[in-house]
Amino acid sequence: MEQVEKFLKEADVYYLATMEGDQPRVRPFGTAHIFEGKLYIQTGKVKGVYKQLKENPKAEICACIKDQWLRVSGELIEDDRREARQSMLDDYPSLQSMYSADDGNTAVFYFQNATAVFSSFQAELEVIKF
């Protein structure tokens, strides 16, 4: 899982796909953080992505660095504990101008039943389950 987090941080931006009814929705994201042995992302409760994940937690992310890409699929489960939100914000100080652990808006989700697949045109697939 650390390899997945490292890749996502190096990529800087990845794309998160969710479903809104039968319509896929994709948007750029930039947070990836390991807390208590789980890979977390962060968003705001006022955003459509939050509502989509609450209705259907199945999601997939995709990131690319040069000729290698990573896809992570699984369920994103909200962790409503303050310490989980604060850990994310501590790892991403730039978010603290927009979010706080106690603002009622900050939300963090962790991957459950996840499969990460590293791909490239030159190497065999590498699969990590967590």
Language-model features, listed with the residues they occupy:
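A short mixed-secondary-structure module that forms the rim of ligand-binding clefts
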Residues: A32-K66
